[in-house]
């Protein structure tokens, strides 16, 4: 006998019935984190002229796991995950730290070294990630190198989150112009968000990741869109000292805010006041050149 999908999810993820049936679902912590080259021995940095990248050191990996443990997110979007075997290593380490993630998404697009990924304590009930997104630049065909992560997560009965992840072109120079590449990627990302919002204006949509642009730059404004019913709000995160930067670019000695969590109007009203944060600790830089951004959602079953 085939079980209905809802009860199959209960069995597969060993979730108590009450957790999914509750009128007021539990609070959900969402986070985005560029873990800086979670790569293995054979990785090659395509964006840096083919120079071979160093594998991520054990000390750095341990620090990454500790940072995630400190935040303890329920849903974590990851940038710069390495090859599939590195993602398996990442998952094992998170499990060993007692973090208890039960479902996963991993995007294999054009960039063979750096991938988007997601870990979740809640079941993923739909996978819509895009791995082959094309555009034309100066008469030449181009692709979004990391693709776009896109999943639907079932938080409770009648309550889902649509999570889109992105890692736009870095600021490292390219012949075609890195800013133009990044803006085209942002345009395509916004097109994807518009399609989601057009299909369901009440969708609880979050878009998170490393966007490699500041708030006053074109790519950022492409993603937020025009003020109105489809505007994607960037959550105003800061750390306990009031700092908002999320990346330290050592080569330029530059601190910047380039990692964001954007939310749709329907989800914005469910963000816990004061919860958006930028992570800070004494060992953040041992782990990565980025700091995670996270926020708490207080779900409501109202339409």
Locate predicted features.
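Bacterial N-terminal signal peptides
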Residues: 7-19
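Catalytic metal-binding/acid-base residues of hydrolase active sites
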Residues: 36, 81-82, 123, 167-169, ...
